Amino acid sequence: MANQNKAYLALTVTSIVWGTTWVASKMGVMHMPAFEMASIRQFLGGSLYVGFFLIKGEKLPTKKQFLWLLGMSLLMFVSSNGIATYGLKFITSGLAALIAALYPLSVVLIERYYYKAIEIKPKTIIGLCLGLLGIGFIFYKDSLTVHGSNYILGVILSFIAMITWSIGSIIISRTKININA
């Protein structure tokens, strides 16, 4: 299979898996505590990830690398995914997906604010707008439905989750750690 076809296949699989996690998480929080469900999901995913690299013959991280990974896991998986999953108790999966789709925009804006040298190019703005419009088109019917008195709490939690994921992504991209991840 050509590299370009592999890339398209990977993008398609990632889009389907990522897109369905919002609906699956929404269903899950109806039947179990949100942080328990998020923990199970992250544990299974992490175990498969580590297993894949061990099968390939990769070494386990050093103590320093492990501590860094632990810190990033707390920021991104506990804070972001845990809070996002908890927020799904109060809002629709479509609205949660729309808020999460603001992630690329928040990364660009945070990087621009803190790292002034970063230029926001027209291509970047067009890509961000098209991505957000695409998610909006898919979830527009579901996204603005208000359910229950804790709706605002769900929106706030989803925004906090999106911002913590953005900050974690920026930290990872700017930290030089020699690890195969």
Features from the language model and the residues they span:
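Juxtamembrane helix-loop-helix junctions in multi-pass membrane proteins
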Residues: 16-47, 92, 167-181
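Specific alpha-helical transmembrane segments that line the substrate/conduction pathway
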Residues: 36-47, 76, 84-123, 161
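Juxtamembrane helix-entry segments on the extracytoplasmic side of multipass membrane proteins
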Residues: 3-7, 31-35, 39, 61-67, ...
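Residue-level signature of transmembrane alpha-helical cores of multipass secondary-active transporters
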Residues: 10-11, 15, 69-73, 85, ...
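Hydrophobic transmembrane alpha-helices of multi-pass small-molecule transport proteins
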Residues: 49, 70-72, 104, 110, ...
